[in-house]
Amino acid sequence: MLPARLACGLLCGLRRGPAPAAACYGPARWLLEGKCEVPIRQRASSLGRRVPPSSTATEDYAEGPDTEERFLFPEYVPERTPEEQVRELQELRELQQLQQEKERERLQQREERLQQKLRAGFRTLPVPEFPDASVPPSGIYCSGCGAELHCQHPGLPGYLPEEKFRDAAQAEGGPARTVCQRCWLLVHHGRALRLQVSRDQYLELVSAALRRPGPALVLYMVNLLDLPDALLPDLPKLVGPKQLIVLGNKVDLLPQDAPGYLKRLRKRLWDDCIRAGLVVAPGHQGPQYPAGDEPLEEIKNQNPSSRSRTVVKDVRLISAKTGYGVEEMISALQRSWRYRGDVYLVGTTNAGKSTLFNTLLESDYCTAKGSEAIDRATISPWPGTTLNLLKFPICNPTPYRMFKRQRRLQEDATKAEEDLSEEEQSQLNQLKKHGYIVGRVGRTFSYSREQDEVPFEFDADSLAFDMGSEPVVSVCKSTKQIELTPEDVKDAHWFYDTPGITKESCILNLLTEKEINTVLPTHSIIPRTFVLKPGMVLFLGGIARIDFLQGNQSAWFTVVASNFLPVHITSLDKADALYEKHAGHELLLVPMGGKERMAQFPPLVAEDITLKGGGKFEAVADIKFSSAGWVAVTPYSEGTLHLRGHTPEGTALTVHPPVLPYIVNVKGQRMKKSVAYKTKKPPSLVHNLKKHR
């Protein structure tokens, strides 16, 4: 494209035609009459000066000593009128537009040629442009949730839009590592789609997997925040005559209320297992009761003949997120279960099964190649993320592998935090922010692609005639995705992640995805303590309420729930008006959406509670509001407390012995002119690291 000034000059010259000759006087007249051509570049330099000897004026020209000095004058260019300037600019714009249109057409033709080449190389797939039940499923399962991929109906698990389904089928290797629309939205946008999957379908899928022939071990994962309702009442019927290990997950979220709190949590989990009708394995001591602490009456009076044949081999506390207790669990599985059969991970929704699946996938419990070939499961606080079975091959714990693993664990235990790399220290600091206790999960053996892709090439003739030559080993760098071959999985045993079983009367069934992210704790819980006297009310968001109706003295109420769920204290006579005004708004936060949301949300239902006080600084009971958390009640002195709890209609409110009986001690000083105490967060501890030097 021409510069504006140059283009304007050219147009101006073409429009005017030849310029008029300048008037010449004196001896210079004969130069013009003789058609003397003086170069333009010489005119400016010779203005008012004598013509240099090298100039070529005419063939007759001869300079003598008496020759008079000659002058040349520039041509006269008349000024342009405004109309001419406007016309020139308009012509210039038209020229520019013409050039832009030609450039645009050239680029468009180039793009069309490229698209034709791409379409020529694609395979066609008979998939309609809209969901259609006549299109058969792909036969390939989502690597995030395990559902079969299809484009039949958006409300069914494994759905992919038509374009994504076609692109996945046309990709190299097919849709083997593709995730469904639901997993994609969960991971990349934090959105969850409600699917048409009932609780009976979940139970049937899990029970069908557990009925498979052959020996199998069941790992039943419970959320410690759901105690004592973490165990399903029909668990023995679901598991059947199989060996069982109970894993108490999310222990990293609970603060230490007193020394020995982990032992008390483990004993509490043992009691719940026995109360659910499970049998302790022969030779196992079961729950250990400290001196003066006896088992519950319903456990002592339980008829052994009425119990099921489901045997509990062990109870362990772990954190699938921070890694606490995971290495010890792997060692126990390799010692006791070894390689006798498949292992199934079972539990309710939001217990953390997919997180443990991903942690074990990168540990010594999975084969080295399987860790590289299998995608991680989709993790989300939304209940029911996993919709089908996910699996990875279990590593056979041979004596050599167990020896190398044990030596690695011993070396890791001798390291201090300062000895770790910057990347490991950064990851460890992030885990400390998420939980109170942290454990490091490592890997002893790693897989390299060259183990399977190093061909042994040689020339037979050269070996026959030249004994000094060596075979040539060439390493072929491949960019293909690592995949398990039939030889890799021959006679292999698998670790299965099963879909979570939905709980009835759970408050999560009433909440939206944004509300669930607020209610479910994902970081270490900081207890919040308030001192209330009779006639006061505690609101836990807009989903729970406790009225202190009557009591001899004040009492401490310690909230153990998500740090993002607000707590509001008011008087009994103002409580109803406050809830009517602020429910669905910022003060109570959950539910969200104002009057329209509250019109769909069920009303709060009241239930009277009577508690008898015990020792000072020890809670007498926990008031649990489904999966939203609990409030530990600690009276000042012995006496009777009359309370009233409120929960949404259709959800469960339970009163049970305190999980953390000394939680009231985890508080700061009382705020001035307030019923609240300053919060205090206990320090985080790393389990398998050497102490600071």
From Swiss-Prot:
Which tissues is this chain's protein expressed in?
A: Expressed in tissues associated with high mitochondria content including testes, heart, liver, brain and thymus. Also expressed in various bone cell lines.
The answer to whether the entry has keyword Nucleotide-binding is yes
Which Gene3D superfamilies does the record cross-reference, listed alphabetically?
P-loop containing nucleotide triphosphate hydrolases
Phosphotyrosine found at: 76
Question: Its family?
Answer: Belongs to the TRAFAC class YlqF/YawG GTPase family. NOA1 subfamily.
Task: Note the subunit structure.
Answer: Homodimer or multimer. Interacts with mitochondrial complex I, DAP3, MRPL12 and MRPS27.
Please report the name of this protein according to its UniProt entry.
Answer: Nitric oxide-associated protein 1
The organism that produces this protein has a lineage beginning with: Eukaryota, Metazoa, Chordata, Craniata, Vertebrata
List the gene name.
Noa1
